[in-house]
A protein has these predicted regions:
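Carbohydrate-binding surfaces of carbohydrate-active enzymes
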Residues: 1-332
Length: 332
């Protein structure tokens, strides 16, 4: 029910080939990734929204923000969202007017790259937009849903993915820690749980506590472990009980480690010594070596296959060299 908009056009406002602020666009991307990762670690379910897709497939129908066949009740604008497309802004205005919820961690001040007083006023209006402070810890209660609820597993190593099906829900749990187990419970709608064994392909029953039409399911995941469950809307007969949880025993390593290839392979060598007209440039990355070689032979921007698009044969017809034009030596 939650759509998080990607700040793509906002980042492009700061990016140029010779950027006067070369770190701003990169920092914005890192901050946005940290934001959505934090949501995932706290089991917030959301989709990512592209403004370009909204342009062709987005609409506002009542208090629902519609993208294709999906409809959302909440739209989130991250702190990095400084610009919105005009089409996106129009959708957000109509969505808010019908009671749709918008959570903004920043105040977009630009529409289609131009400063907009209308946008500033809209996103600052508490009657239309729920303001959230990007400088404070995320208030995860804003994203609570009656459909599914987790306890607070220690360490925030748990990630999950859920899909609604015709007769129930598919729930995948994964422990991202390589050293610590993750234990806890999850509560969601359903009447019976089944374990889908991804190793054997078997389907077995899985113990759960039922209260009305809701199930509380306990999980206990080994480091790097996972669990795939199916939660049925109605009870099913004939499901064998799940096998007992295996106990892992640490086995100390004995002897040295020997590795050998199963078959011949390719080893990429990224560095070389470049020789141009008798001058040697040692220990260059292959990208830099190619750039220097092309520049030496008249391509001012460097490697044309990295910096330009060829029109007809304008690049290949400049290949008049009979001896290659350079020497590259690779060290093993």
């Amino acid at each position: 029910d939650v759509l998080v908009l990607e700040p793509t056009t906002s980042i492009w406002m700061y990016y140029t080939y010779n950027a006067p602020r070369p770190n701003r666009w990169r920092t914005m991307g890192e901050e946005f990734q940290a934001f959505i990762t934090a949501l995932e670690r706290h089991q917030v379910e959301f989709d990512l929204g592209s403004e370009n897709i909204l342009l062709n497939h987005g609409s506002a129908k009542g208090d629902r923000f519609v993208v294709g066949k999906r409809a959302y009740g909440t739209v989130v604008l991250p702190a990095q969202m400084e610009n919105v497309d005009a089409a996106t802004f129009d959708l957000l205005e109509r969505f808010a007017a019908k009671g749709g919820r918008i959570i903004a961690y920043g105040t977009p001040q630009y529409v289609d790259g131009a400063r907009s007083a209308e946008a500033e006023a809209f996103f600052a209006d508490p009657a239309k937009v729920t303001r959230a402070d990007a400088g404070e810890p995320i208030d995860y209660s804003l994203f609570a849903t009656p459909e599914i609820a987790f306890d607070a597993p220690e360490g925030n190593y748990l990630f999950h993915h859920r899909r609604r099906m015709d007769d129930g829900q598919l729930l995948f749990l994964a422990n991202s820690s390589l050293t610590r187990p993750v234990r806890g419970t999850v509560t969601l709608q359903g009447r019976q749980a089944a374990l889908l064994d991804t190793r054997t392909g078997e389907i077995r029953g899985y113990e759960a506590q039922r209260e009305g039409d809701r199930l509380t399911i306990a999980y206990d995941l080994h480091p790097a472990g996972s669990l795939l469950l199916y939660v049925f809307d109605e009870e099913r007969e004939g499901l064998a009980p799940a096998p007992a949880r295996r106990v892992l025993t640490a086995v100390p390593a004995a002897g040295g480690l020997t590795a050998k290839p199963d078959a011949p392979n390719v080893m990429t060598i990224d560095f070389c010594d470049l020789e141009l007209d008798g001058k040697v440039y040692p220990d260059l990355n292959s990208y830099d070596a190619a750039k220097l070689a092309y520049q030496h032979h008249g391509f001012k921007a460097g490697n044309p296959w990295s910096t330009s698009v060829q029109f007809r044969d304008h690049t290949v017809r400049r290949d008049t060299f009979t001896m290659g034009g350079f020497n590259a030596s690779y060290r093993f």
